[in-house]
Amino acid sequence: MSRRFKPSALVGSIAAMLLGIWTGLALSGPDAERSVPAAVRGDRNPADSAWSAGDRAYHFGFKKSRNGEPASIDQEGFGPLLERYGAVFRGSPEGRNLYLTFDNGYENGYTAKILDVLKEKGVPACFFVTGHYVRTEPELLKRMVREGHLIGNHSWSHPDFSKLSDEKIREELDRVKREVADITGQKDMRYLRPPRGIFSERSLRVSRDLGYTNVFWSIAYKDWDTSAQRGARYAYENVVSQLHPGAIILLHSVSKDNAEALGAIIDEARRQGYTFRSLDHLMSPLPELPM
């Protein structure tokens, strides 16, 4: 690179980047009864003429399922907003369908095993990928598509969409879509998982206008911290205890626990009468045919 940086500036940049990554992962990995604090306003100054209600930042959170009852966002305050822009966090409670999704920010050596399990069990999934993943893991992307899975958009650089201009949001999404298409041949990309779980009315509108459905989740746990893995049994119990009809399951592919527990999770869900479906089924459900 031709531009040279002062060491102090470089250290500051690295620290800021790491803080941003940590914050993003924290917000993507809920571990409490409510996954994150209720909706909060972004750090824009309301006195700034550029600020508007459409820039208010929401951090996705939900009340976890208990005893098979559907997870809820009623207490979060953003339910009507998601409905207005066609976003989803779970499917219909009618029928016993589950939708398996993975967030792939970077590769930690477990995605191949996850794909092996999905292939063995005949389960479809959607993998939400970032620009880093696209650039570093082209062969895994090809395998995902070849084996019938969907690749969704998790943005190019994992930013807070509520702080980006409309143009920057479009650039973030278009670049992922374009490069995934170049690598895999998947021309259509319809599903978006907002990076860090942060969104605004404006980001919902901009992404909807680009043809995306924002896909949140109704099952998750703190699985993203690779330094605090607690074993396959822990992963299994956290997911199975939250199962409910129509659930969208969020797992992070960096988790060793998830990779080791996935087969048992699928088997137990099926034992309870659940069927794993593609997100395409959620958005365009086929009529149930008589046996």
PLM segments and residue spans:
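Active-site beta->alpha N-cap acidic-glycine motif
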Residues: G61-S162, K168, E172-A181, D188-M189, ...
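N-terminal pre-catalytic segment of deacetylase/amide-hydrolase enzymes
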Residues: S2-L100, E107-I114, E120, Y274-M291
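Alpha-helical scaffold elements lining the catalytic groove of polysaccharide deacetylases
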Residues: Y110, P159-T184, I198-P245, N258-E260
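Active-site beta-loop-alpha junctions enriched in small/polar residues
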Residues: G105, T130-H132, W156, P195-G197, ...
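Structural recognition of the beta-strand scaffold that forms the well-ordered cores
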Residues: L98-T101, A125-V129, L150-N153, R190-P194, ...
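A short acidic, amphipathic alpha-helical/loop segment
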Residues: K113-D116, E139-L140, S203-V206, A261-I265
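Catalytic grooves of carbohydrate-active enzymes
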Residues: L243-D280
